[in-house]
From Swiss-Prot:
UniProt xrefs under InterPro entries: AAA+_ATPase (IPR003593), ABC_transporter-like_ATP-bd (IPR003439), ABC_transporter-like_CS (IPR017871), ABC_transpr_MalK-like (IPR015855), ABC_transpr_MalK/UgpC-like (IPR047641), Mo/tungstate-bd_C_term_dom (IPR008995), NA-bd_OB-fold (IPR012340), OB_MalK-like (IPR040582)
CDD domains for this protein: ABC_MalK_N (cd03301)
Pfam families given in the database record: ABC_tran, OB_MalK
UniProt subunit comment: The complex is composed of two ATP-binding proteins (UgpC), two transmembrane proteins (UgpA and UgpE) and a solute-binding protein (UgpB).
Stated family: Belongs to the ABC transporter superfamily. sn-glycerol-3-phosphate importer (TC 3.A.1.1.3) family.
Organism of origin: Salmonella choleraesuis (strain SC-B67)
The protein, known as: sn-glycerol-3-phosphate import ATP-binding protein UgpC
Binding site for ATP: G37, P38, S39, G40, C41, G42, K43, S44
Length: 356
């Protein structure tokens, strides 16, 4: 197995504006890292830099302890799986999987052995003579993965491989990818805009925004302790509730526009007078009562999701979303009294957006 290291890597198209800010990442042997972020955040550009399809402006890339920054893609020991499968339509499944090995001059027996083994792992044994047009979307994606597997690369690179599949098939393919990684233990770098893919597949997640790695951590870490307001808003469905306000002069209240306020602990007294953003996830808000000092939420709409429900409403001028149990279905216009547990709240600096 082999590791991957990015050392202060940057990318600029015009020599002035850096679309990838200096970024350092160490991927351990056999680790599965997912880069996630909105369109235009730089994740696919970074993946292409690792693959050698984009030139690195500055910094270095290391694969299997070898510096590959200026190497051609074919010499880097990588295999890439694309969003659009990139299969040859006139070739059979077997020929598609074997083609890369054939042009490298491998023996016929060696090629056949690798293709048969990959087909067995991916359950493609009975499809080897078919053409891509005779396959479903999921089968085509498995062929694309098989073509990567037969190369026995040091690193797998996945560029949004499930984006073209329907919702049900994406779930199935996520499970297959998890099983495949447990079996092969090959170092993998995976790009997606889908946070569900990121959270379910990754051993560590790198959340990107405007060319910056906002946070690198386990799925649990980025969910429970988001490093910035951006991460808090991007990870989680529905998104975290974010309320802009200020720490009171006494340091014991979080004050919001319209005379609203929430008590806060003594830990934040050193931030008195500072603008802050308070965050809390919809699933961490509990039902309370007026007598218990609950926050009144006027329900605007209710989303019925089956297993649970989402109530969207207003607390004064502040918008809030709360996740409710299946049997709790408040009518529009009704009032819910809510408890925002202090240990489930997050505070972010009002200027930098960084976690306090």
């Amino acid at each position: 197995m082999a590791g991957l290291k990015l050392q202060a890597v940057t990318k600029s198209w015009d020599g002035k504006t850096q679309i990838i800010q200096p970024l350092t990442l160490d991927v351990a042997d056999g680790e599965f890292i997912v880069m996630v972020g909105p369109s235009g955040c730089g994740k696919s550009t970074l993946l292409r830099m690792v693959a050698g399809l984009e030139r690195v402006t500055s910094g270095d890339i290391w694969i299997d302890r070898k510096r590959v920054t200026e190497m051609e893609p074919k010499d880097r020991g990588i295999a890439m799986v694309f969003q659009n499968y990139a299969l040859y339509p006139h070739m059979s499944v077997e020929e598609n999987m074997a083609w890369g090995l054939k042009i490298r001059g491998m023996s016929k027996a060696h090629i056949e052995e690798r293709v048969r083994e990959a087909a067995r792992i991916l359950e493609l044994d009975g499809l080897l003579k078919r053409r891509p047009r005779e396959l479903s979307g999921g089968q085509r994606q498995r062929v694309a993965m098989g073509r990567a597997i037969v190369r026995e690369p040091a690193v797998f690179l996945f560029d949004e491989p499930l984006s073209n599949l329907d919702a049900k098939l994406r779930v199935q393919m996520r499970l297959e990818l998890q099983h495949l990684h447990r079996r092969l233990r090959t170092t993998s770098l995976y790009v997606t805009h889908d946070q569900v893919e990121a959270m379910t597949l990754a051993q560590r997640v790198m959340v990107m925004n405007k060319g910056v790695a906002e946070q690198i951590g386990t799925p649990v870490e980025v969910y429970e302790k988001p490093a910035s307001r951006f991460v808090a808003s991007f990870i989680g469905s529905p998104a975290m509730n974010l309320l802009d306000g200020v720490i009171s002069a006494s340091g014991d209240r979080f004050e919001l526009p319209g005379g609203l306020a929430l008590p806060i602990g003594a830990d934040y007294r050193g931030h008195a007078g500072r603008n802050m953003t308070l965050g809390i996830r919809p699933e961490h808000i509990a039902l309370s009562s007026q007598a218990e000092g609950g926050v009144p939420l006027t329900v605007d709409t209710l989303e019925f999701l089956g297993a649970d429900n989402l109530a969207h409403g207003r607390w004064g001028d502040q918008k809030l979303v709360v996740r409710l149990a299946h049997q709790q279905r408040p009518a529009a216009g009704s009032t819910l009294w809510l408890h925002l547990p202090e240990h489930q709240r997050h505070l972010f600096d009002g200027e930098t957006g960084q976690r306090v």
